[in-house]
Amino acid sequence: GVPDRVGEHAARHQARHAGTEATPHSHAAHARVTDPRDATDVDFDEVNNKQHYALYSVFALGESLPADDGERGRIIAESLDYVKGAGAEIRGFYDVSGFRAEADLMVWWLDDDPEVLQDAYHRLRASALGKFLDPVWSCMGLHTPAEFNKRHIPACFGGVAPRDWAMVYPFVRSYDWYLKAPEERARIMAEHGRNGFAQYPDVKGSTLSAFGFSDYEWVLAFEADSLDRLEGVMHAQRYTEARLYVREDTPFFTGPRVSLGEWAERQPRA
């Protein structure tokens, strides 16, 4: 049957915040503490001096999966093995069903070689599972050193373990943004940070460059252990001057991290 992920999450949340009186939305409940899931020996210079790519690919279930448990399990196992053969790291599969009517599955891949990511994508589409999937959206991003703080690196390349939920979206800056003085952009982005991650330190962000890769300039992924934290940081960042310099920041794809087998168990069968 389908694992009780709600119960599992509740248990994890209770364990993390045992002994506190904070509400789920309070910032006291998410103080800056070292999370044992994360690496603490990350070399920022090494990360910045190498190329690191991510690929976010979203699919819809085009037709129902087989009703036979054995056949369905075989499809998932064989497809997963085939996709892993590309060599790309799979940061997560995400169930995005219900958040958008046209999407069901998001895959987040990581690698230092963009062609390896392409191979992983091709393999998924060519796999037994791929025959049931229709492409909806895909975007590749590249880590480039942050303009104002070289020690700010994407969570996905900075030793931060995957969280229970992910939100991915692209965005495009206004035409005049890049013509502003660097110190002015730094001031605006500092305020943006104070209204976002400073208030929600448990939310982990990965901002990657996408110039020339697609129709976007940047692609972002936020991760947290509960959905309300993702909503909170996005809402808080609306009250900043930086919002005046955004031309486009859709579509959004959001969902819980699941195994591919879990995802398949939730899908229609025929």
Role assignments for model-derived ranges:
Residues 119-127, 232-238:
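Short amphipathic alpha-helices in soluble, non-transmembrane regions
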Residues 9-13:
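Short linear/disordered segments characteristic of secreted peptide precursors
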Residues 24-84, 112-117, 134-198, 211-213, ...:
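Short S/T/G/P-rich N-terminal loop/turn motif that feeds into the first structured element of a domain
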Residues 81-103, 130-145, 194-219, 233, ...:
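Short, glycine- and small/hydrophobic-rich beta-strand elements in well-ordered beta-sheets
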